């Protein structure tokens, strides 16, 4: 009887609005200092963050963890695809190998600009749902190409779709997750590792068994179907992931985006729907939003009116960019992140895009350059990336590490393992060093993908992600140009990549914001 009474009391307290409001006192503090953001937006965003915190991490957020992870999966699979099919495609079409990577990276650049900047203008939902559809459909079509020009053009369109995944999906996930669970954005990189593993596992038997021998003088379509089967398989898989997103998961528009547009009533409706989906009540009301906005608004009526007009505008303007440079601290943070993404983008693309090619080349020196050995090694390397995501999720929450420390250490070790690959005197030694590289680079990327959207205000988050993604894609375009003039059988690309990544680790320590324990607005 006492136990029943106690449960009834607890249940009543759980649904009592006053009790729920008391929970807000334990919310993580805001990441941004007072005055860094528009005062009206900052007040509203804080209230929205508190409402999401009191709803908690429920069914909706865990479902979003899965479907947002599809973006990480796709962003891993398709750039890797350019390198997985490179050797058999070069054998058949006889072209200069870096041109395929160049086409893909051109598409990735266009996609990063279009989708990331667009999601701050027309909202998150369309960008979130369409990017996978484009990647899957054109990836499937690429498998039927008869020449290199058609393949490169279709790969560019695939890149356009894939380019929007990471900037948009990270913004979407962070917009809905409680502040105390923001570390899950780092763990989302597990999907990136799974993507590499799945692509490598499928490529291994297909490329090894249905390809012309390496170095063959004549290679016909009939003898070289492996890379086509691979594109058909992963294109179809990407379309399946899109269908799950579009038809199964009810993605709602971001309440933080809606508040940033002045659409407060719609934001409240979304919060209530999430609470209902999770089986939790929400105490947030439209009157509360209006009250905090009134208190935070400047006394100057003209300034208030101007702010409302700007918040309701749905056209592109420079305000989203200006918001990322509103204070010296924000400007330094944004500039440093853009530089980090550019440097790491150049280094990683230069190395990752040609890794199977490098493995085959170096394997030839060691007498084991077969497709079977090359793609077996690629699978082993991919497996080692999986535990890195979990270690990254743990490390970013440690008091003496946080996001910045974890990023700096993992980047430094990634560069060290890259340098170590140049000392390999056997295929197994080369494989071992590359496993170390894969493990630490997955930690590095997991943190980098998380800290960037965390330190951008939600109303400008898509634009911020777009700037960093554009930087990494622009520098990614430079990588195949370097490869056109570099000797890929030497260690020069490795030295360049390693030095750049180590330098980026040192730069990470200069970031002014540490999101650990703080709520992003």
From Swiss-Prot:
Glycans are attached at residues 209, 487. Major facilitator transporter probably involved in siderophore basidioferrin transmembrane transport. Belongs to the major facilitator superfamily. The keyword Transmembrane helix applies. GO terms for cellular component: membrane. The chain crosses the membrane at residues 62-82, 99-119, 126-146, 148-168, 187-207, 229-249, 330-350, 379-399, 404-424, 431-451, 466-486, 491-511. Residues 11-29 have a biased composition (Basic and acidic residues). It is a multi-pass membrane protein. Residues 1-29 are annotated as: Disordered. InterPro entries: MFS_dom (IPR020846), MFS_sugar_transport-like (IPR005828), MFS_trans_sf (IPR036259). One of its GO terms (molecular function) is transmembrane transporter activity. CDD domains: MFS_SV2_like. The keyword Translocase does not apply. Keywords: Glycoprotein, Membrane, Transmembrane, Transmembrane helix, Transport. It is found in: Membrane. Residues 1-10 have a biased composition (Polar residues). Induction: Expression is induced under iron-depleted conditions. This is MFS siderochrome iron transporter 1.
